[in-house]
């Protein structure tokens, strides 16, 4: 089972479905996804995985932003998460970097969402692999993930 099939299965368990688009050219980076979709990179909801003291921390942020983990994320969470290595990302989420979706992870994760995403009617997130994306409203994304919303950008 590939990452996209795994994500579809987990969506089903959550009682939700999202049509996904597949691009053979890849959507591994926010820039790649925006190019394939023909949208601004800010409309990409990238999922960045960090190591927390007890569980992974996933920050869903605008593709145009970088996460300020040393100051803003630390203020929101009460600790500064560490950068995660690819092996950790795969083991904790069930997905490879570049395809980590904002929900449907293997293990429970602490979720944080960039407040900047709420300025858009819809955003695009990875759908389990580096070739698939799906569209969702920011409010629906926050509802599904239960993410803490805040200012996380540098």
Across the structure, where does each feature detected by a protein language model lie?
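Extended, low-hydrophobicity, polar/charged segments
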Residues: 1-154
């Amino acid at each position: 089972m590939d990452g996209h099939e795994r994500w579809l299965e987990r969506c089903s368990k959550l009682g939700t479905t999202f049509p996904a688009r597949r691009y053979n050219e890849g959507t591994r980076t926010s820039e790649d996804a925006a190019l394939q979709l023909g949208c601004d990179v800010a409309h990409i909801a990238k999922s960045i995985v960090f190591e927390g003291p007890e569980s992974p921390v996933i920050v869903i942020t605008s593709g145009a932003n970088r996460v300020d983990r040393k100051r803003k994320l630390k203020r929101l969470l009460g600790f500064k998460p560490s950068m995660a290595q690819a092996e950790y990302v795969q083991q904790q989420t069930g997905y490879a970097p570049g395809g980590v979706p904002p929900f449907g992870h293997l293990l429970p994760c602490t979720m944080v969402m960039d407040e900047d995403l709420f300025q858009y009617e819809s955003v695009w997130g990875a759908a389990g692999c580096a070739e698939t994306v799906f569209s969702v409203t920011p409010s629906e994304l926050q509802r599904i993930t239960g993410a803490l919303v805040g200012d996380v950008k540098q």
